[in-house]
């Protein structure tokens, strides 16, 4: 007979720094959720929210609910709140903590080389270690950047980003403008407008092909350091 006090077995996970590296290199939402909820007590886990993580940073840095109020560990909840300023403060605090500085930096993939940022184009004068993040209409990068033997924390969030390629290119232009004397690289062409389906589409197709060819959608963005 098995009772609630019987131990059936033990499982030892990988070290926390290894789990963090897997999370950041693969951009694993499942790992991010697990790490956030692992900090909660048994009772707190019933809420389904990252209670301890949220309380710690809000109290430690004096962040308001509009600046920092995550509703999950992965950041996918549309009800969560995270400002670029709050994330910048957190990155700076982690950098100053000698016990967390090296393992956290090691958990971030190098831009243009590895992880989810291996295809990200950055200026050759810069070495960047970044975590990428995206959901519909939003793309961001956050981490640390080395330029001329000086380290910087950087956060970039593009809200209302219809075109992901444009959001990435804008981030590249930002780094180019801040840290080099090179001319800014061009932005990709705007995404073409998709014609509506049905009767309206049939009527439109009878019109001038030249006018249709010139039509393009307007993409908007709001960038800031993430």
Task: Kindly give the residue locations of the regions a language model identified.
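A small/polar active-site loop signature that marks catalytic segments
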Residues: 1-98, 102-103
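C-terminal soluble interaction/assembly domains
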Residues: 56, 66-209, 213, 218-226
């Amino acid at each position: 007979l098995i009772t609630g006090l019987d131990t059936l077995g033990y499982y030892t996970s990988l070290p926390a720094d290894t789990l963090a590296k897997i999370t950041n290199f693969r951009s694993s939402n499942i790992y991010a959720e697990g790490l956030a909820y692992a900090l909660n007590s048994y009772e707190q886990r019933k809420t389904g929210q990252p209670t301890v993580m949220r309380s710690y940073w809000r109290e430690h840095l004096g962040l308001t609910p509009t600046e920092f109020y995550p509703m999950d560990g992965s950041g996918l909840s549309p009800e969560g709140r995270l400002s670029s300023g709050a994330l910048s403060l957190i990155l700076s605090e982690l950098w100053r903590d000698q016990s967390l500085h090296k393992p956290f930096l090691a958990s971030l993939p190098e831009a243009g080389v590895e992880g989810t940022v291996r295809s990200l184009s950055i200026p050759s004068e810069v070495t960047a270690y970044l975590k990428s993040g995206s959901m519909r209409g939003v793309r961001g990068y956050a981490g640390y950047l080395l330029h001329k033997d000086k380290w910087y924390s950087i956060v970039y969030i593009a809200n209302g980003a219809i075109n992901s390629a444009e959001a990435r290119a804008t981030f590249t232009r930002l780094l180019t403008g801040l840290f080099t004397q090179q001319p800014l690289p061009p932005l990709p062409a705007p995404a073409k407008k998709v014609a509506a389906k049905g009767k309206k589409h049939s009527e439109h197709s009878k019109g001038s092909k030249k006018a249709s060819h010139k039509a393009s959608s307007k993409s908007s963005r709001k960038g800031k350091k993430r």
